[in-house]
Amino acid sequence: MTMQTVWQTYQSMTRDRSVTNKKVARSTVRRIFRYARPYRVIIAIFLITLVGTSLLSVAQPLLFRRIVDDGISVGNASLVTWTAVAIAGLAIGDAALGLVSRWYSSRIGEGLIFDLRTQVYDHVQRQSIAFFTRTQTGALISRLNSDVIGAQQAFTSTLGGVLGNLISVTVVLIAMFALSWQITLASLILVPLFLLPARYMGRRLQALTREQMTLNAEMSSQMTERFNVSGAMLVKLFGRPDAEAGLFSGRASRVRDIGVRIAMANRWFFTALTLVAALATAITYGLGGNLVIDGAITLGTLLALVALLAQLYGPLTALSNVRVDVMTALVSFERVFEVLDLPPLVRDPDDPRQVPEGGLSVAFQDVDFTYPTGAQVGLASLEGVAREESVHAGEPVLHDVTFESAPGALTALVGPSGAGKSTIIALLARMYDPTSGSVRIGGIDLRDLTTADVRAEVGVVTQDAHLFHESIAENLRYARPEATDTDLIEACRAAQIWDFIESLPDGLDTVVGDRGYRLSGGEKQRIALARLFLKAPRVVVLDEATAHLDSESERRVQLALDTALQGRTSVVIAHRLSTIRRADQILVVDDGRIVQRGTHEELLAAGGMYETLYRTQFADS
């Protein structure tokens, strides 16, 4: 038995049998075939190469028989020479076919990975924000990597392995029965003895491998959470480096110990298979040798049978696990399809309308909103923990919200924490659709526009501005990829951040670090504003955008807002008195309702909640 055969048998026997009893819907199989359709020609060629490889593998032992019986035994040197040349030619042909087979299987597998990964990535990006608030990032990345690769194996390792082994076993058995049915039957009697150690060690290796994967996942999770700026800062602030090192060391030592056990189990596995194969070969030599002595078969036939026997046990054992192999691949497909079948909460209309030209008004009309439940927006298998609904899921958080902001007007939202201000902003950016009522820009319901058009017209700066671990220029061009350096500089000047960028050694090419942590809060905010100005939306949303700025930074941002927001409709969650005083209307939000509205002076004169908020939050300003 060759090492390649032993390794293929090992891979098959160590598949996770937890999937054996799973039932996969027929629709899943049909769907897989649809993914395979673009590769049907390549798959056909791949199968032809498998058949060719099997035939060439069987042909070589038959030529051994000829070279012994018809060449060496009778002293025919010419036949020996030409048969040896033929054997060499078959070996070269077998190797060439193996390369061709591998090339085509790689084309199939890598093409499938590309198709699935790009489709899953695009689909996930279209999910609502609620999906990401519930989903464990590591589990989602696993779907994009591990499960997609597992699905790919259905067309490479599993498809090639199952069909290749089936073809090999069939061709080898036909050849062996044709040479000697007695020796062939004796060899098959040993098959159960061959399967027993493989199955036992396979189960043992499965358990150890699952334990190792769990331990590695725990270590990976610890590193992911600690090896970012926020996690590292928390560890340092609480003086926990030694404790963290001890925790990691404990997990690493368990991985070390399990690795040693797996190595020994592997050794026992290969030893058992090799011993059983050697026993089968010994029996074949013993029985076949006596048949040669009796004249029932020739010496060449015996040698050919031994060579064929070496090709039989590995594929035969692997085929005994065909259900595990196939189900493992199908379950991987099913897990990928589970993500693809999750419908986005916000969808584009079949017949979208166009955004009108000119200034855009913003209007909320009788809007009620309830945050979706986990079953509506997420997958329990991606959440990492037992599903628990958030405080607001399934409960109304906005009630009969109605207001209108004229083109170019500034509307300020004020109110206590949890009143519903951020929810109003999320609806305006169409992160969600209202449960009832409508949200309109330019008189058109957002649900009648494509999400691309909404995002092009509505620009948002959140309280915690997110920057990618890239250069300042790349972060700015996220808003407009085709922007020139001149465009970037103008946007930065409008955001009062160019002087700072110009003072940096690398200027616009300065890398901002993970989430922009190399910059101060005020610098991040102003770069985010520059990105907004570069986008040049007609509706601007500032979600507590100046909450982290010092007085000088706020002054500079206010100067930028005064000029950059002219002619644009603005909705601001206000935390600064200067913003409130500039507002054309102020909406006081409490418990999901607009309880007061008017200008700063009007609301102060009217008393009520606004006056209370003003006295407690803004009076010192």
Residue spans of the language-model regions?
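Membrane-integrated ABC transporters
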Residues: M1-S57, I72-A86, S101-S105, D122, ...
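Cytoplasmic coupling helices
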Residues: T2-Q4, W103-D122, Q136, G160-G164, ...
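Short intracellular "coupling" helices and adjacent cytoplasmic loop segments at the cytosolic face
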Residues: S12-T20, E110, T118-S142, S146-V148, ...
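Juxtamembrane helix-loop junctions of ABC transporter transmembrane domains
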Residues: R17-A25, I48-T49, L56-D69, L90-T137, ...
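An intracellular "coupling" helix at the cytosolic face of ABC transporter transmembrane type-1 domains
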Residues: F33, V41, I129-A130, S146-F155, ...
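Transmembrane helices of ABC transporter permease
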Residues: P38, I42-L55, S157-E211, T284-I297
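Helix-loop-helix
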Residues: I72-W82, A175-I189, R261-E334, V339-L340
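ABC-type nucleotide-binding domain
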Residues: P356-S621
